[in-house]
UniProtKB/Swiss-Prot annotation:
GO terms for molecular function: DNA-binding transcription factor activity; sequence-specific DNA binding. The modification 4-aspartylphosphate is found at residue 78. Residues 154-214 are annotated as: Disordered. It comes from Oryza sativa subsp. japonica. Residues 214-273 bind DNA. GO terms for cellular component: nucleus. NCBIfam families: myb_SHAQKYF (TIGR01557). Disruption phenotype: Dwarf, narrow leaf, lesion mimic, low tillering, late heading and low fertility phenotypes. Keywords: Activator, Cytokinin signaling pathway, DNA-binding, Nucleus, Phosphoprotein, Transcription, Transcription regulation, Two-component regulatory system. It is found in: Nucleus. Two-component system major event consists of a His-to-Asp phosphorelay between a sensor histidine kinase (HK) and a response regulator (RR). In plants, the His-to-Asp phosphorelay involves an additional intermediate named Histidine-containing phosphotransfer protein (HPt). This multistep phosphorelay consists of a His-Asp-His-Asp sequential transfer of a phosphate group between first a His and an Asp of the HK protein, followed by the transfer to a conserved His of the HPt protein and finally the transfer to an Asp in the receiver domain of the RR protein. This is Two-component response regulator ORR22.
Length: 696
């Protein structure tokens, strides 16, 4: 008992001596990024007889504290520092080591001070700091040290004041704190008790943590087979009516919840939406680059015409590509153009001035100018072809050898009639059209070619009504061109027309030649009048000029046929119409040829070569589209100036010249119809060789 009392006195004496010398030599760590403030703070602390260690970086201060935990008693740190905020340093020091920290700053706002205190600062000083404040900072060190010591002493006193158990050798009222062995045993018991509690707590925590993980649902992996069932269920219900509940019932898959199906359905709808966006983008690209698929095409306005507006393609009118409307080409390549332009059709005009006269009758037929704008009052105006009945040229194409040969290849296909108020009349338009007009293909399941009567190509027609009627000896038997030709047919056609070829060679004034091609070769012979064809057969249709001399010679004496024969046979005005077979999906307008009774051909000599390629087709969906070329010379003055006219080397003139019909008059004539017949001037050719699209 006496030994214990002596020890207590020694401890009190040591504590008394420390308390008497404590402020002197207190170890302080000063941290401030401002060197001036740091120097002032260090000087003031030294005046207070503190041992000072200064640094201008918070990271360096933290490193020093971690290396030597017992090296400092107090830390004074600035709040705002570049490398680390003062509050962050305060938190780290408070967590890692039990040292008092004093914050130092120029910001004295209550909010900032409150933040420092709540983060664990023992004091908050404002700059400039005073020495009086620094002299009292030691109290925080004492409070922290003696506060911890008092707590330890309190625990120690509680252990000593506990009553001793009855079975011990000591008396019932003797304290048990005098023996060190008893203190050791009590501390060990206390640690073991706390250790058991900690182990039980850890076990409970482990069980509690295992329960949420066990309650989690397994992740669903959408395999290929599972996705197929999902897609089949969605297709059966419909994408608009598909709901997760019904999809789950149709799929009938175990361990698949409604939430899984709902999530997958949402992703599937987003996938379909992205596919639709990609498809629309591809359609726009195809339309921009002139694709031929009608579902992707949206036709724009015609180039240079403000009155035409874009219109969508329909089944009645195939799509039209305006980019190929007017393109220049040389006349020298007129004969070779058939071989180069197989996938598309071109109309090339090689002429100086061609007078195009459109005459109207009340019993007009066929279609024209579909897709004119709503600005002129007719948003869906049908194309009006100009026809005029004429009985004078009923037997223009004569020859007994052609009667039986072409009986199986020709058929009359009349055009559909339209009301007279939708017909178009254009008085006279002088057109100088050297550019080639590209006619995109037009879809047709069957093409039945009719010479002299009509050719109805689905939405397009090439007719010569009245000019070449069928009662001149031609039969109406049809020959669908999707069936193949053979060599016997070509030989028969060539043999039956040999005499007619010799006869027309002697006349040399007006000839019509048709080339029948039994194969897919679309190349036309360069000289059509010789009857040579790369396909093998040639049909020559002679003209009975004696019966129709009134159509071939009229006007002034200078243009008479006898005068032309007397001057030179080389002065021949030729017009080549070349028809080429090709797959067709687009055709903007139709082409007609009319030679009516009141039309006059004022040229002295007229040579008309017509060639038609009928290609062997095995596919029923393929069709043949006429490809036409016009090379015309009319002016007699030009014929007098030159001795020889070369049909393949005529110079083309570009542009559009309108003397008798302008755009305003052309559009006004759609609404107001003039039904009077129009006379034709001498020395000019008046015929309906061009549709409205060609005039424009």
């Amino acid at each position: 008992m006496l030994l214990g009392a002596l020890r207590m006195e020694e401890r009190k004496g040591l504590m008394g001596r420390e308390r008497d010398q404590f402020p002197v030599g207190m170890r302080v760590l000063a941290v401030d990024d401002d060197p001036v403030c740091l120097k002032v703070l260090e000087t003031l602390l030294r005046r207070c007889q503190y041992h000072v260690t200064s640094t201008n970086q918070a990271i360096t201060a933290l490193k020093l504290l971690r290396e030597n935990r017992d090296m400092f008693d107090l830390v004074i740190s600035d709040v705002h520092m570049p490398d680390m905020d003062g509050f962050k340093l305060l938190e780290l020091v408070g967590l890692e080591m039990d040292l008092p920290v004093i914050m130092l700053s120029v910001n004295g706002e209550t909010k900032t001070v409150m933040k420092g205190i709540t983060h664990g600062a023992c004091d908050y000083l404002l700059k400039p700091v005073r020495i009086e404040e620094l002299r009292n900072i030691w109290q925080h060190v004492v409070r922290r040290k003696f506060g911890n010591r008092e707590r330890n002493n309190l625990d120690f006193s509680k252990e000593c004041n506990k009553p001793q158990s009855a079975d011990t050798d000591h008396g019932p009222y003797q304290p048990t704190c005098g023996s060190s062995d008893q203190n050791g045993r009590s501390s060990r018991k206390r640690k073991e008790l706390h250790g058991e509690d900690d182990d039980e707590g850890d076990d409970n925590d482990y069980q509690e943590n295992d329960e949420p993980s066990a309650a989690k649902k397994p992740r669903v992996v959408w395999s290929v087979e599972l996705h197929r069932k999902f897609v089949a269920a969605v297709n059966q219900l419909g994408i608009d009516k598909a709901v997760p509940k019904r999809i789950l019932e149709l799929m009938n898959v175990e361990k698949l919840t409604r939430e899984n199906v709902a999530s997958h359905l949402q992703k599937y709808r987003l996938y379909l939406k992205r596919l639709g966006a990609v498809a629309s983008q591809q359609a726009s690209i195809v339309a921009a680059f002139g694709g031929r698929d009608p579902s992707f095409l949206h036709i724009g306005a015609f180039e240079g015409l403000q009155s035409y507006q874009p219109f969508a393609p329909s089944a009645a009118l195939p799509s039209f590509n305006p980019h190929g409307l007017l393109t220049r080409t040389s006349a020298a390549a007129a004969f070779g153009l058939q071989e180069l332009a197989a996938p598309s059709s071109t109309i090339q005009t090689s002429t100086g001035n061609v007078t195009v006269g459109h005459c109207l009758e009340e019993n007009q037929q066929a279609n024209l100018a579909q897709g004119l704008t709503a600005a002129i009052g007719q948003p869906q105006l049908q194309q009006n072809w100009i026809h005029q009945e004429g009985n004078g040229l009923s037997d223009v194409f004569s020859g007994s050898s052609l009667t039986n040969t072409l009986s199986s290849t020709l058929q009359r296909v009349p055009s559909s009639s339209l009301p007279p108020q939708e017909l178009l009349e254009c008085k006279q338009a002088k057109v100088s059209m050297p550019p080639s007009i590209r006619i995109p293909p037009s879809s047709s399941a069957l093409l039945e070619r009719t010479l002299g009567v009509s050719t109805n190509l689905g939405d397009s027609s090439i007719s010569q009504q009245g000019a070449l009627p069928i009662d001149g000896g031609f039969s109406a038997d049809r020959l669908p061109l999707h069936s193949s030709f053979d060599g016997a047919v070509a030989t028969k056609l060539d043999t039956s027309l040999a005499a007619s070829q010799r006869e027309i060679g002697q006349q040399g004034k007006f000839s019509v030649s048709m080339l029948v091609s039994p194969s897919d070769n679309l190349a036309l012979a360069k000289n059509a009048k010789t009857g040579a064809s790369s396909s093998g057969s040639t049909i020559i249709l002679p003209l009975d000029t004696a019966r129709h001399s009134d159509y071939l010679q009229f006007g002034g004496a200078s243009n008479s046929l006898q005068k032309m024969d007397g001057q030179k046979q080389d002065h021949i005005q030729s017009s080549n119409i070349i028809w080429s077979s090709m797959p067709s999906t687009q055709l903007p307008s139709d082409t007609q040829i009319h030679n009516t009774q009141n039309q006059r051909l004022d040229s002295g000599s007229f040579n008309h070569n017509i060639g038609a390629h009928l290609a062997d087709q095995t596919n029923a969906s393929a069709s043949i589209l006429p490809q036409m070329k016009f090379d015309t010379r009319i002016s007699e003055e030009k014929m007098k100036q030159k001795n020889t006219y070369d049909l393949g080397s005529s110079k083309l003139q570009g542009g559009f010249n309108s003397s008798g019909c302008n755009f305003d008059g052309l559009l006004n004539s759609i609404i107001k119809v003039e039904k009077d017949d129009l006379p034709f001037m001498d020395n000019e050719l008046g015929c309906d060789l061009f549709p409205l699209g060609a005039c424009i």
